[in-house]
């Protein structure tokens, strides 16, 4: 919470069924339009909420129009002198950077081509990202997929789909190679092209 990023609320709870104790459960906040309403007081028809799930990108609320426009702008104008200023009109840059840093720090390899939710207020709002489902973090499943879940993975390469990461797409031990094949670059293109801009690089580094 102190980082100023949106995240899925979580609370361990004791679970009872018909008065009989069943065990400890993880009670989690939904990351749909209810999340935005309960945290920001905005109704479903006031927001765009985008979901990236495995091979699919969809609008949970509103449309994809503003998101697609933002991605197109980043891909085509990252070298412009006013890029950072224009980007700041489309997204909450500091929140996006903090989201990136957190996901990379925990080595969440089930992301960014999966488990990604992005939202904005339609009227004058900027896109924000929601942290959720980081169970692949910290090399938790390293034994299941050594290359893909290695806690020493270069997450900058992984997140941008460059370097050695592109070679893992053909590895039988890579459970998530879909993030790096040629037809799936749309999943990493936003961060990749943002990082081609010096002003964004500087902000990310500081």
Give, region by region, the residue ranges found by the protein language model.
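Catalytic-core segments of enzymes that bind and process phosphorylated/nucleotide-bearing substrates
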Residues: 1-206
